[in-house]
Amino acid sequence: MIAYKLVRRGRDGNLYPLFIDRNRPYVFGEHRIAEYIPTKGFAPRLGFHCCFTPYAPHLKQNLKSGEKRVWIECDIDDFKTYPRPPSQGGEWILAQKLTAMRVISQDEVKKLNNDI
């Protein structure tokens, strides 16, 4: 199933998770299996956090620190949904298997979000 994930674009140009296992880059085409990585300050929710659409209003895309975030399209499998309030984008996906496929442009993000 296609899903969307917000990631950090590192200074080296690689794409990294926002919070958990944040130093391991995503590689397009690489199949990843979720691992439990305890991280202080975060609830223990095993799985790659993804969205049905590229919409997460509680997460900024351009931070004051200069960090840039972009949406990637992913192929996911073995997932469950996790209910969240509309202010956090509604339902989240917790996927056990993820393959990062490509960065989606801001124009694509707008179109995908207008289509819902």
Which residues does each predicted region cover?
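Generic "edge-of-domain/loop-turn" microfeature
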Residues: 11, 55, 79-81, 103-108
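Charge-dense polyanion-binding interfaces
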Residues: 63-104
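Intrinsically disordered, low-complexity, compositionally biased regions/tails
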Residues: 17, 33, 51, 93-94
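Generic preference for hydrophobic/aromatic residues in regular secondary structure cores
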Residues: 4, 48, 100-103
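Mixed-charge (acidic/basic) macromolecular-recognition segments
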Residues: 95, 106-116
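Catalytic toxin/effector domains delivered as secreted proteins or via bacterial secretion systems
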Residues: 42-50, 54-57
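ADP-ribose/NAD+-binding catalytic cleft of ART/PARP-like enzymes
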Residues: 1-45, 61-68, 80
